[in-house]
A protein has these predicted regions:
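N-terminal leader/linker segments that initiate helical-solenoid repeat arrays
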Residues: 1-79, 91-94
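Solenoid-like repeat scaffolds
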Residues: 3-9, 41-50, 82-88, 117-125, ...
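Generic helix N-cap/helix-start motif at coil->alpha-helix transitions
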Residues: 10-19, 50-58, 88-98, 123-133, ...
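Residue at a conserved register position within TPR or TPR-like alpha-solenoid repeats
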Residues: 24, 65, 103, 138, ...
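Structural motif corresponding to the intra-repeat A-B loop/turn of tetratricopeptide repeats
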Residues: 27, 68, 106, 141, ...
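TPR-repeat structural position
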Residues: 30, 71, 109, 144, ...
Length: 249
């Protein structure tokens, strides 16, 4: 069950100053927006704000830093947002996801994974994109089994909803199957890629895998299909196809 929180109100005069800073930020006057926000959290100002108001000030500060591509500073402000007590649960959940993304942007993979796992614990309905993000994190730290589990989950979720998973999701799965020498699963993924994202590399690689499995008829059929689409532009590929024809006779 979801915890209930008693979030303090955002008072009108505070809201008006935040709106003023927001308007400046949208006009890309980041310095002007920062002046207002810094005044709000100066020694005197800070004492007058409740936790939810402070969280909103830090949240807008984080946005300003992000807009200037100062990711470490943006991260520090987002950490301040979630350190405020009794902020709305949705605000904390969204901020935790942003924190994870910011770690990944800075290639701090393990911290990103840890932040994302904390987000997963709080989120009742994680989406497929979050599982892919986690898979990419695990891939970067070479935890390939965990990467595969998560990208498989994402693909299954999307397919189950009648949506087409992204090409890069399939490619991550394909790489991970190859790495563990699960060539049957790699072939399944390649055959899916051929249907939805037909590119030369998928036809040629699938043909090669059928060759590894000593399934020459399929190996030849895929090379022929690639040839008919004008994909075979290297002489070595045409030689391979000629050999397959000779063996097939």
């Amino acid at each position: 069950t979801r915890e209930t929180r008693r979030t303090p109100a955002l008072r009108n005069k505070v809201y008006e100053r935040l709106a003023e800073a927001q308007t400046l930020a949208e006009a890309k006057d980041y310095a002007g927006a920062a002046v207002i926000l810094n005044d709000m959290i100066s020694e005197d100002g800070k004492r007058a704000l409740n936790s939810y108001e402070l969280a909103n000030v830090y949240n807008l500060h984080a946005f300003l830093s992000y807009a200037k591509e100062d990711y470490p500073q943006s991260l520090r402000y987002y950490e301040q947002v979630i350190s405020q007590p009794d902020i709305p649960l949705a605000m904390e959940i969204n901020t935790r996801f942003t924190i994870a993304q910011l770690y990944f942007v800075q290639e701090k993979w393990q911290q990103g994974i840890d932040a994302l796992l904390m987000w997963f614990e709080m989120n009742e309905k994680p989406n497929a994109g979050a599982y892919v993000l986690l898979a990419q994190g695990y891939y970067q730290v070479k935890r390939y089994d965990l990467a595969l589990d998560n990208v498989e989950t994402a693909i299954a979720m999307h397919e189950g909803e009648g949506k087409l998973p992204k090409e890069q999701w399939y490619n991550l799965a394909r790489f991970l199957y190859f790495d563990k020498e699960d060539f049957d699963s790699a072939l399944d993924v390649l055959n899916t890629l051929i249907i939805y994202y037909p590119k030369k590399q998928y036809w040629v690689q699938a043909s090669h895998l059928y060759g590894e499995k000593k399934d020459e008829p399929r190996q030849l059929a895929l090379m022929e299909a690639a040839y008919e689409q004008g994909f075979l532009d290297r002489s070595s590929e045409l030689v391979t196809m000629a050999y397959l024809y000779l063996n097939a006779e």
